[in-house]
C-alpha cells in the first residue's frame, strides 16, 4: 500500500492507495470521528460498493443517501438534500460523512461537510480516475451555478482519502479517458519525466495494468499533495493545476453540464492553452504536437465544439474564479514540465486561438 500525506499542520491527512483497500475495515475506521456515519453516493456507484462499505462499518450507526448521477446534479438542490438528510435524523458534529463516488459526489459532499453545523469531518472514497488523481485531494468543494462551474463552495479538507484502484475496473471507458486528462495535466505543468513516462506507457494505462495504474495515481497524488501543501487556497502555485480549466469550464457551461465530461472539456481546453502558449513563443510546435498526441492516445478530444465561437467562450471565461481586477488570467504551459499564470493575453490572441482550435 502507498501512503502519502497532505501536510497542512493540524489539518494534515493521509492518502492511501492500493488495490482492494475497500475490503479492510480499518482503512476507514481509523479516521472516523464518533459512532454515526452517513455515506453519500449515487445511483451508479451504490449497487457496486455501498453494501460493502456498510458491512465494513458494522460497529457504527450507518445511514446512507443515494443521489442521482451526473454533473447536472452538482447543484444547490442536491446540497440541500444532503443538509435535509442530516437534519431530519438529528446528526451532530460527531457525524462523519463518507463521499463514495466520483468528482461530483466528492465536491458536493465536501461542501455539505464544510457547511453543516459549520463543519463536520468527511472522508473521500473516490471511485473514478479523475477523482482519484485530482478532485479528492486538496479540499476544493463546490456546487455549480447555471452561470458558472464551481462558483459556490469552500476550501475544506477531508480527514482521509482512500483510493482503491480496483474501483476503476467498473469505470466506463469514456469516464476513464476523462480522468486521463487530469493525469496528463500533471506532466505538462510539473514533471516532464512523468510526461515522458506517460508517452511510453499509455497503452499499459489503457489496459489498466495494475502496476502502471498504481504508479500514475501515486505520482499525481504526490504532485497534488506537494502543491496543496505549499498553497492551500490557490493564491499562488496551486493555480497551475487549472491548466485547461478556464477554457474547459466555458465548454461545460455552454454545452450543458454533463454533455461534455469535465475531463473531455479540460483536454480540449489544454490544447487551446497550448496553442495560446505557442502563439506567445513559450512552447515549440514539437511540444504542442507531443501534447496533442498524448491526449489523442488517451482517447480525448483536442478541439473545441465547432459551434462554440469566441463570444461564447469569452462570456463564460469572464466569470472564471482566476479573474482579478477584471483581467482574465490563464494558465499556460512553458515547454513541457512547467507552467505559468499570465494576465496579458489579448482578446485578439484569444480570438485567433479559439477560431483555429475549432477547425484544427
From Swiss-Prot:
Any idea of its EC number?
4.2.3.4
SUPFAM superfamilies on file: Dehydroquinate synthase-like (SSF56796)
The prosthetic group or cofactor this protein requires is:
Co(2+); Zn(2+); NAD(+)
> Which is a GO BP term held by this UniProt record?
chorismate biosynthetic process
Give the UniProt keywords, A-Z.
Amino-acid biosynthesis, Aromatic amino acid biosynthesis, Cobalt, Cytoplasm, Lyase, Metal-binding, NAD, Nucleotide-binding, Zinc
Could you say which residues bind Zn(2+) here?
A: 182, 245, 262
Compartment(s) where it occurs, according to its Swiss-Prot or TrEMBL record: Cytoplasm
Q: Which reaction does it catalyse?
A: 7-phospho-2-dehydro-3-deoxy-D-arabino-heptonate = 3-dehydroquinate + phosphate
For this record, the Gene Ontology CC terms, alphabetical, are: cytoplasm
Q: Which cysteines are joined by disulfide bonds?
A: none
Q: What is its main location?
A: cytoplasm
The positions annotated for binding NAD(+) are 69-74, 103-107, 127-128, 140, 149, 167-170
Per UniProt, the cofactor note for this protein states: Binds 1 divalent metal cation per subunit. Can use either Co(2+) or Zn(2+).
Q: Which family is it part of?
A: Belongs to the sugar phosphate cyclases superfamily. Dehydroquinate synthase family.
User: What PANTHER family does its record include?
Assistant: 3-DEHYDROQUINATE SYNTHASE (PTHR43622), 3-DEHYDROQUINATE SYNTHASE, CHLOROPLASTIC (PTHR43622:SF7)
Query: Which NCBIfam families does its entry note?
Result: aroB (TIGR01357)
Its annotated function is as follows: Catalyzes the conversion of 3-deoxy-D-arabino-heptulosonate 7-phosphate (DAHP) to dehydroquinate (DHQ).
Question: How is this protein named in the record?
Answer: 3-dehydroquinate synthase
Amino acid at each position: 500500500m502507498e501512503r502519502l500525506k497532505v501536510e497542512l499542520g493540524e489539518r494534515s491527512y493521509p492518502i492511501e492507495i492500493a488495490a482492494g483497500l475497500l475490503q479492510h475495515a480499518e482503512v476507514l475506521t481509523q479516521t472516523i470521528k464518533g459512532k454515526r456515519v452517513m455515506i453519500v453516493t449515487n445511483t451508479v456507484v451504490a449497487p457496486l460498493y455501498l453494501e460493502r462499505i456498510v458491512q465494513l462499518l458494522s460497529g457504527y450507526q450507518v445511514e446512507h443517501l443515494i443521489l442521482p448521477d451526473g454533473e447536472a446534479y452538482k447543484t444547490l438542490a442536491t446540497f440541500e438534500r444532503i443538509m435535509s438528510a442530516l437534519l431530519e435524523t438529528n446528526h451532530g458534529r460527531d457525524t462523519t460523512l463518507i463521499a463514495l463516488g466520483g468528482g461530483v459526489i466528492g465536491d458536493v459532499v465536501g461542501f455539505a461537510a464544510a457547511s453543516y453545523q459549520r463543519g463536520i469531518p468527511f472522508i473521500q472514497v473516490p471511485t473514478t480516475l479523475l477523482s482519484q488523481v485530482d478532485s479528492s485531494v486538496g479540499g476544493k468543494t463546490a456546487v455549480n451555478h447555471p452561470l458558472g462551474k464551481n462558483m459556490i463552495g469552500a476550501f475544506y479538507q477531508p480527514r482521509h482519502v482512500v483510493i482503491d484502484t480496483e474501483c476503476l475496473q467498473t469505470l466506463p471507458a469514456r469516464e476513464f479517458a476523462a480522468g486521463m486528462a487530469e493525469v496528463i495535466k500533471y506532466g505538462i505543468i510539473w514533471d516532464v519525466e512523468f510526461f515522458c513516462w506517460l508517452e511510453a506507457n499509455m497503452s499499459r494505462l489503457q489496459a489498466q495494468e495494475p502496476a502502471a495504474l498504481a504508479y500514475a495515481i501515486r505520482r499525481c497524488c504526490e504532485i497534488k499533495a506537494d502543491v496543496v501543501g505549499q498553497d492551500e487556497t490557490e493564491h499562488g502555485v496551486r493555480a497551475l493545476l487549472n491548466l485547461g480549466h478556464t477554457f474547459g469550464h466555458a465548454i461545460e457551461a455552454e454545452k450543458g453540464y454533463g454533455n461534455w465530461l469535465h475531463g473531455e472539456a479540460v483536454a480540449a481546453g489544454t490544447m487551446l492553452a497550448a496553442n495560446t502558449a505557442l502563439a506567445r513563443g513559450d512552447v515549440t510546435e514539437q511540444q504542442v504536437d507531443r501534447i496533442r498526441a498524448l491526449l489523442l492516445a488517451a482517447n480525448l478530444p483536442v478541439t473545441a465544439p465547432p459551434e462554440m465561437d469566441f463570444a461564447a467562450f469569452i462570456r463564460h471565461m469572464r466569470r472564471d474564479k482566476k479573474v482579478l481586477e477584471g483581467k482574465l488570467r490563464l494558465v499556460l504551459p512553458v515547454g513541457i514540465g512547467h507552467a505559468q499564470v499570465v494576465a496579458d493575453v489579448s482578446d485578439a490572441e484569444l480570438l485567433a486561438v479559439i477560431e483555429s482550435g475549432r477547425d484544427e
